[in-house]
Design a protein with these regions (language model features):
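Nucleotidyltransferase catalytic core that binds NTPs
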Residues: 1-171
Length: 171
């Protein structure tokens, strides 16, 4: 209770699995029973193309949480940008009253480890030592490439002429 009050919060929702999934839940979609939400199109691109039912689960549990909590606003991390876009579409397409419209679904910058800039994520906690060492490399390369691109832009180098130097910098 003290930690919640310290951050200006009086309540926290800690639902039990059986409350959220009264018919039970299994990872095998063919065996699932009950109502589920699917956002067609957006859910089947990028990450959804290799995990075809992932966003179905996200959309379903977020819908349930929104129905229980009825938030004025919702906040999602930028590291899961596709998820945030799917949720914005969900909120608009199903005419959610809480939060009322996608303008109240906010995307916040990714929180990163100050040492190596790896995104702080529940999934990243499962990385072994080697994976933990390698994981920040992509973000470092992207930031380096962005720096080169932006530097060339300040020198009025045309976008078409920025590609080669940017790619060379990150290799």
């Amino acid at each position: 209770e003290g930690a919640l009050q310290k951050h200006g919060r009086l309540m926290v929702l800690l639902p039990q699995v059986q409350d959220m999934y009264p018919n039970g839940i299994t990872q095998n979609v063919d065996d699932q029973i009950g109502a589920f939400i699917e956002v067609k199109g957006l859910s089947h691109q990028m990450e959804g193309s290799t995990r075809p039912t992932f966003f179905r689960g996200v959309a379903t549990v977020v819908t349930k949480l929104f129905n229980v909590v009825m938030p004025d606003r919702a906040y999602f991390g930028q590291k899961d940008i596709q998820q945030a876009i799917v949720i914005r579409r969900l909120v608009d397409d199903l005419l959610f009253m809480f939060p009322h419209g996608s303008r109240n679904v906010h995307v916040l910058p990714t929180v990163r480890d100050p040492q190596d800039q790896l995104a702080l994520s529940s999934r990243n906690k499962y990385l072994d030592a080697q994976g933990r060492h390698v994981a920040p490399v992509l973000y470092a390369a992207l930031k380096k490439g962005q720096g080169v691109w932006d530097d060339l832009a300040t020198k009025n180098v045309a976008p078409a002429d920025r590609w080669s130097p940017t790619l060379e910098a990150v290799q």
